[in-house]
Amino acid sequence: MSNINKERQIRGKGVIIKTIDNFAHWLYIKIIFGFFGRLFSSYSSGERVFARSAVSKVANGGLVRNKAGFGKIKRKVARSFENSTTVRIYKKLLEKLMSCKLKIYGTFFAISGLLIFFEYFVHKYSITGISPHSSYYIIGGVFLIASLPLLMSKMTLADALRRSRMCKGIAVGFFGIDDDRINRYTASGGDSYPIAVIAAFAFAAASFFVNPLTCVIAIAVLALICLIMTIPEAGVNITVFCLPFLGLTAHPTRNLTVMVLITSLSFFVKLICSRRVFKFKLMDFMVVLFGSLMFFGGVFTYGGDTSFQTAISYCVLLFGYFLVANLMRTKTWLKRCINAFLTSSVFVSAYGVVQYFFVKVDPSWIDVNIFPNIDGRVTSTFGNPNVLAVYLVLALPLSVALLMNSKKTSKIVWYSLQVVLNLCCCVLTWSRGGWLGVIAAMIMFFFMYSHHTVTVTVLAALPIGLAVPYLGEILPQNFVSRFASISSAIDTSSRFRFGLWNGTIEMIKDNFFGGIGVGTDAFSNVYAAYAVSGTESAIHSHSLYLQIFLSLGIVGIVMFLGIIFLLFKNGFERMLRSKDRFAGSVILAGLSAIFGTLVMGAVDYIWYNMSIFFMFWFVFALVCAYASADREEEEREFVPISSDETQSDIFFEYDSHTFKMKVNKNGREDN
């Protein structure tokens, strides 16, 4: 009898799971092929309409009458640039460096290291009055250790890049320096020991007066600039990777702006030389309009010159969208770009976790009277826990997407580490808006990924829902109290926001059409007359939507929401039509990341930090670029079924069956 009861229990559980799975299947199909599917399945038709417009033709050179003459001018400019003295010197120097033997580099490092140690003792025991910095013996020791394997090697730098898995992985996987580029340098450059000795003494002479770490950074920056001017796509990867660490510098926004400008210059030069292409599409047009509004928000403003400088910074960083959309035109480059972002996020998250457990964090970010059991909130390299949380909300869905599409054990371990570290660091920010953003992003991702993930989500939600009354006993008390305070009016942060939003709404009523201009100075100068008691110190509205509405007026907020709507139309349409499961997953992850930040933006002004402003539009551009790359790849492989532009075909692979839906003008479905 006991065996029969067990079998009945197993069957009962199977029936429950099957019922939930069928419900998830039904819900998923309703989402994909219902109103939602119809609403987000017509982006391509709008793109085709825009492609025939005068704006598109002007931007893409379609109205140039004498194309042959224009082409001759471009070729002449390209030849004059490529034959210039500067370019020839650079190519010759690069050839020498790549064909130089590693033992020459080892000689440079060994002599430089010894001289730097000598300088350390000179400064320490002489009467120069200069106190030696610890970087002297650190750099000297690193140089000496690095010189040992180099002195024993017989390979050239090009050989090392070809043969070393680590060097080749960085060169190819990060910078895009493929084998064709490396194989150009085959001959040995000879034994240039005198040059190595002279270079070592020159470096030591410079480090005598300047911190040697500064000299190393200057050389690295110069090398990266040369690399970016050669491969502008590498500039995007370098910028995205270095962005979090710019927060450790004195001027992070200025440094980020310079990196974007250098990459833009490289792209412009390649464009003139016909080495890259520029395609102006519907989304690009909308972003240009929004950027123009932000620029004029710095011209016509209550904030004066500071607002104008802020508007210029916004416009320069917004150009990062066009760099990603036009340089990352292949899935290979897009994968490199995503990996650069996620690898950087691992270091940021790891530092944040270490900071929480081993470094005393700043307690001023938390109301210790209400949350006495929370020691502080991690900031990692960003200096602000809420800013860090936005960064992690953007990274986490992409990490999950790559993990779910990984098959190799090494990649599964690597992406699992990314997910765990990003999630742990996000929790330790104690950012309630960040937590809501992560929850919203993950719910959207799993609900749209497949009906199986919907089933898992529902199965997980049931026990969690039943356990809600007991979460206080299961989870740490500090976590429960922090999360429960989201809607609490007792928390000082919540009270501050409620009062601030009331004052901001009153400002919007009086500046409904034109706004007050961009920047914190514009807000501070006007808000004083509307401030609610206790919120006089506010420098922004703590809401993305209210801030855009207040800064740019009704036109600005409508245009922003329209751009977001177009992004989701573009992304979901491509996700549903794509034959590439990985591409669809990445697009969905990007949309989920944007959705998570938009949820967080309801309670915080996430664009206050310029780095986050850039990263928002970076992920935005990733979705557009991946959709375009996937669309163009399929157009090369498949012939369109119908040329009828009033119809939109959606193909979606589900459980080895292909569903096809045609949505006609009347909105009816034919399955």
List each language-model region with its residue ranges:
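Hydrophobic alpha-helical transmembrane segments
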Residues: 394-396, 553-565
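Flexible juxtamembrane loops connecting transmembrane helices in multi-pass membrane enzymes
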Residues: 156-169, 372-378, 469-503, 509, ...
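Transmembrane signal-anchor hairpin modules in multi-pass inner-membrane enzymes, especially those
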Residues: 1-296, 305-306, 329-339, 405-412, ...
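Membrane-interface catalytic loops of GT-C/OST-like multi-pass glycosylation enzymes that act
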Residues: 305-309, 382-386, 429-433, 539-543, ...
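Alpha-helical transmembrane segments of multi-pass inner-membrane proteins
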Residues: 36, 94, 98-122, 129-154, ...
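Membrane helix-loop boundary segments at the extracytoplasmic
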Residues: 121-129, 241, 245-249, 549-552, ...
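Membrane-interface helix caps and helix-loop-helix hairpins in membrane proteins
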Residues: 208-209, 249-252, 300-308, 427-428, ...
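Long extracytoplasmic/lumenal interhelical loops at the membrane interface
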Residues: 366, 487-502, 506, 510, ...
